Amino acid sequence: MAEISAKLVKELREKTGAGMMDCKKALKETDGNIDKATDWLRQKGIASAGKLEGKVATEGLVESYIHTGGRIGVLVEVNCQTDFVARNESFKELVKNVAMQIAACPQVEYVSVDDIPTEFVESEKSIEMGREDLSNKPENIREKIVQGRIGKRLKELTLMDQPYIRDQNKTIEELIKETSAQLGEKVQVRRFIRFVLGEGLEKQESNFAEEVAAQTGKK
């Protein structure tokens, strides 16, 4: 068993907000491993979730989802702050549901509006400003209309702004916040990719009779 030093106990106390004796016991139970001791304290309901606020969310799961028929596939990374939460069934269920959401949203390309490149936003603005239905509008009115249209367009492209497929009254962002509050630590979708069978490929059309003839060596 590793030696449980006063320095180690102090470090765990600062990280979790738990009492000295609880920290010492947690470290003994986990052979001096700080991360495992933190999980042990949280499992016992002793650690303060508030102490985790400044911790970077580097734990979590990468989930895959293949839609029925194998024509659509998704990979998504969802992060949390501790391995303890990453193993939680509620967290696992969230990640699975997010993957299914992405599969159901072909227009979604980004996690949030903040991820959309400035160049794209400026291009959309330029297109909207040049539309004929705005040509006779005063500049300030035109600007407001364009901002509204762009805002709507950007939300269509972002995962966080999508209505949750299992409850249309809430967005994915609200679902993430609810789960984060339930688990007591920060939860965030970091990245995802969506695959569609044959996407980007030009399907070659052929005459079935000619194809059979070619395969059998007949003309």
UniProtKB/Swiss-Prot annotation:
Record-linked HAMAP family: EF_Ts
Keyword Protein biosynthesis: yes
Task performed by this protein: Associates with the EF-Tu.GDP complex and induces the exchange of GDP to GTP. It remains bound to the aminoacyl-tRNA.EF-Tu.GTP complex up to the GTP hydrolysis stage on the ribosome.
Location(s), subcellular: Cytoplasm
InterPro entries per record: EF-Ts_dimer_sf, Transl_elong_EFTs/EF1B, Transl_elong_EFTs/EF1B_dimer, Transl_elong_Ts_CS, UBA-like_sf
Cysteine-cysteine disulfides: none
Protein biosynthesis in keyword set: yes
GO MF, one annotated term: translation elongation factor activity
Alphabetical list of PANTHER family matching this protein: ELONGATION FACTOR TS (PTHR11741), POLYPROTEIN OF EF-TS, CHLOROPLASTIC (PTHR11741:SF10)
Annotated region (Involved in Mg(2+) ion dislocation from EF-Tu), positions in chain: 82-85
One Gene Ontology cellular component: cytoplasm
Record's keyword terms, sorted: Cytoplasm, Elongation factor, Protein biosynthesis
Sequence similarity: Belongs to the EF-Ts family.
Listed name of the protein: Elongation factor Ts
Organism: Trichodesmium erythraeum (strain IMS101)
Pfam families (alphabetical): EF_TS
